[in-house]
Amino acid sequence: MYKLVLVITAAAARAECVVKKQTHAFYYLWYGTPTTDGKWLHWDHAVLPHWTKKVRAQYKHLENYTHEPPTRLHAPFYPAAGPYSSSDPQLLDAHFSQLRDAGVDAAVLSWTGRPGGAVSDTQGVGTDAIVPLAIAAAKRAGIGAAIHLEPYEGRGAESVALDLAHLVTHDLYRLPRRPCGGHDRLPVVYLYDAYHTPAKEWARLFCENGDLSVRGTPHDVVVIATLLNRDEEDLVVNGCFDG
């Protein structure tokens, strides 16, 4: 099983099983500019309510404030390249070359839902069409591309089963489900905010005996849950996540 903070590491348990440390960087594909995309995307993101009552009360006056690019951006730092479009191939080449030079093995691409559906992020932005561009840029830079499956309304075992059937058609970065033992290498998918869904629901999809199990099928993946708190680790085990 893989453990995740923001960097994947796997330690060799036996002398004959030496596992290379992996570094994965999350890369968001939802940015846009009027020149390339017809309007600002995500740079003008509205301020959302904080998830804890105490912090929300402190900053309630800022809720729904909308940033005003190009001078005021929804970003902790102003990009060196200025506000950019994620669908700009030259920009993607530059960013993935920087990731390669920093020693990153794979970029984890934010994905907001299947094409043709009503699924998008909270700002109404879909990223599916940009994924092939980003994968191609990652290949040119010599790094891999994994998927970061964003939450959406109604996300559960049945919808994610359809998501995986779509996502595995891409040439994604692969790892074995277990670091040692000669397991097949499978596409790597991160499930963001997995804790919003009960473990028993994920077990339907990721446990071998689940009624929707992808294990051993063409849609099988190395699936890693992203969590907020250590007390959510039971979700990883009971939901049959790989890390």
Task: Please give the residue ranges for each predicted region.
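Glycan-processing catalytic domains of CAZymes
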Residues: E16-G243
